[in-house]
Amino acid sequence: MQLCGSSELLTETDLGESQKQLKKKQKNRVAAQRSRQKHTSKADALHQQHESLEKQNHALRKEIQALQTELAGWGRTLHLHERLCRVDCDPCPVLLPSGCPIQAKQPSGQPAPLGYNGCQEQLGLFQTPGSSPRAQHLSPGPCSHESPGLLPSLLPSLAFDPLMVRTPLAQLSPSPVLSASSPSGSSLLGSFSKLDPLIPSPQDQLAPPQPLRQEQPTSGRLASSDSPAALGPECSQNREHLPALPGSSTHWQKSSVAPSPQALMAFPLLSSAKVHF
């Protein structure tokens, strides 16, 4: 009887433990299912994101290939145009027939290019007698206000050069570009215009000297009548028809009259500059 009672107690304890174990197993199964669902949901989201990125990458690759083909086509057309159309980008050539046109395009505040003054100087030196009237208009002729005392000093130095003797006397006058650009040239022209009424012309040098009071109004009239505005285009025609005098420089040097002391006292600029005519 005692053995049977002890066996019954053991079976009751085993049943309780087995039930607890079953409950734990069920809980573990539910937790495992939840974790599996979470992992599967995350994996599905990552897979969908990866597929979308692959689609975008494929579209971008197609666009890159299209742009590369277009770039290659533009490069070929550019290469063909460079062979056909060659453009020279020189700022200013050495010799120009009718002046440098780049100077007109330059703004007023910026300086002129380096080759512009050289173009104007070479146009003034290498001008032939039969040149265009536009080129002759650039350099003022002997009809303008120019002191005749400067020509005898320039002609002996140029008489030994055969190239410079062939150039007309109009080219020996100062260039308007140099006189306008350099302040020294403008000051010299101003002083020459002041001395112009006192210096006798070549026609007056051949005549006997007259008193100073009578010579000033006549020289002023001659200076006003010899201006290019008064003479007009006839001055250039008469200059071409006049014969060239071979001994004009020596004749002017011999026939030049020294200024009177009254003129030197009246104008101290002449005495200080020591100008000899």
UniProtKB/Swiss-Prot annotation:
Subunit structure, per the record?
A: Heterodimer; heterodimerizes with JUN family proteins.
Q: Residue ranges of region Leucine-zipper? A: 46-67
Q: What upregulates this protein?
A: By cytokines in response to infection. By IFN-gamma.
- What protein is this chain from? Basic leucine zipper transcriptional factor ATF-like 2
Briefly explain the null phenotype: Mice display normal development of natural killer (NK), T- and B-cells, plasmacytoid dendritic cells (pDCs), neutrophils, resting CD8-alpha(+) classical dendritic cells (cDCs), and peritoneal, liver and lung macrophages. However, they show significantly decreased survival after infection by T.gondii. Notably, mice show significantly decreased numbers of lung-resident CD103(+)CD11b(-) dendritic cells and CD103(+)CD11b(-) macrophages after infection.
Can you list the disulfide-bonded cysteine pairs? Answer: none
User: Where is the segment annotated Disordered?
Assistant: 15-50, 126-146, 191-256
Q: Member of which family?
A: Belongs to the bZIP family.
Annotated bZIP domain ranges read: 18-81
**Compartments in which it is found:** Nucleus
Task: Keywords in alphabetical order, please.
Answer: Activator, Differentiation, DNA-binding, Nucleus, Transcription, Transcription regulation
- Spell out the GO cellular component terms annotated for this protein, sorted alphabetically and separated by semicolons: RNA polymerase II transcription regulator complex
Any one Gene Ontology BP term: myeloid dendritic cell differentiation
Question: What spans are recorded as compositionally biased (Polar residues)?
Answer: 213-227, 247-256
Single GO MF annotation: DNA binding
Asked whether the keyword Cell cycle is assigned, the reply is no
Write down the SUPFAM superfamilies for this protein, in alphabetical order.
Answer: Leucine zipper domain
Domain of life of the native organism: Eukaryota
InterPro entries, per the entry = AP-1, bZIP, bZIP_sf
Compositionally biased, Basic and acidic residues: which spans?
Answer: 41-50
Per its database record, what is this protein's job?
AP-1 family transcription factor that controls the differentiation of lineage-specific cells in the immune system. Selectively suppresses CCN1 transcription and hence blocks the downstream cell proliferation signals produced by CCN1 and inhibits CCN1-induced anchorage-independent growth and invasion in several cancer types. Possibly acts by interfering with AP-1 binding to CCN1 promoter. Following infection, participates in the differentiation of CD8(+) thymic conventional dendritic cells in the immune system.
